[in-house]
């Protein structure tokens, strides 16, 4: 079953649906571990698929009718070319087809294991997917990133494309080219055979004597209704309607096979052009009804925030991550004149894009003073500018040195400092219980928010040269309005 994580990335997890079943639930006590089906090594493993038998029967029918009946009826100067061209194509198709069926496309670590014993039954109560973190829970081996577990073969296939029922084998990285050569050779051979059958069928009504150039027909000049088949090795007498019926049946089957093989070949050419596999194409074009589970998981991921909402969310998160003494209330509105109600608080327990859910302790009754100089200075910490300008028409600038004692009295100290060259983890900073410094926080912001810092900073003539801390708002005493103030 195809799944997506809540960060909109397709996961490398494929669970069997039909061939691998889960044990029925017992009313009391855990059920004993049962054994599932065995893994199939290649296309010769038992049982054969019905479409595989149909493919072999069609190959025999085309070969017998083409080489035994139709090609010997061609004019004598065309017979050698007919045998040579069609024989080479049919022989080449047989070789690549047998090779594609015989190759084991499983992952290298799976091939190193023994196929003797059956695999355990997949239990969905213990694992959500068969492959998790590049480890197959059924094959019990580490697999590559492009490997998928085939439910029909019950094994992990490297570079999985699809399970071909005509080959009764999976098509993966090891036999994909052989599969394409098999399809192309089959299409070319059927096209030539249809052309020969059409010529014989039409020429029988136009000039049947052109079909009787073989030396065996010289003794039957007065019996035009008698024909020979399987020339020249084992001539067998037959009637004209039988040859016409076989030629018409071959034309119909050949046209049907040409349409199917041509569509399949064009489809795989399209996939190669776009560098996709059949599995990836099916997943991308899966109808929306089958992706309801994915949408339900995506609902828990917060939507993309605007820059102002992003700053507010950072401030709330820093407040949550900073330990406070028990019994002490959170920061209230420091300056109601310069405060503004915040956006609605996120739902407690909402899961972010990675990591455990963040429980934000926020009082809905108290507005968030998101423009308060105290909170801005507390969030910036040592990276704050020397002066904080109020909104236009609302008083002069406020020096940060006068605000720092008020910050310490109200318990709005800056977050814990981190090393300057700290390596930022791949998970978002909001999902970790560690407080990151202000420059790290700004690097985590959106490009639009970072642009606001640079736009105001470059307006100052005393902007320091670009270096390790060039993104931080250091203005060397300049009274510049900070963003969102």
Swiss-Prot record:
One Pfam family recorded for the sequence: DHHC
Instruction: Give the protein's recorded name.
Output: Palmitoyltransferase ZDHHC1
Q: Where is this region: Disordered?
A: 1-41, 324-358, 462-485
The gene that this protein is the product of is ZDHHC1
Give residue spans on the Cytoplasmic membrane side: 1-52, 99-185, 263-485
- A Gene Ontology biological process term: protein palmitoylation
Q: List GO terms (cellular component aspect).
A: endoplasmic reticulum; endoplasmic reticulum membrane; endosome membrane; extracellular exosome; Golgi apparatus
Q: Which GO terms describe its molecular function?
A: DNA binding; palmitoyltransferase activity; protein-cysteine S-palmitoyltransferase activity
Quaternary structure and interacting proteins, as annotated: Interacts with STING1; ZDHHC1 constitutively interacts with STING1 and in presence of DNA viruses activates it by promoting its cGAMP-induced oligomerization and the recruitment of downstream signaling components.
- So which tissues is this one expressed in? Widely expressed with significant expression in heart, brain, placenta, lung, liver, kidney, testis, thymus and small intestine. Expressed at lower levels in adult pancreas and lung.
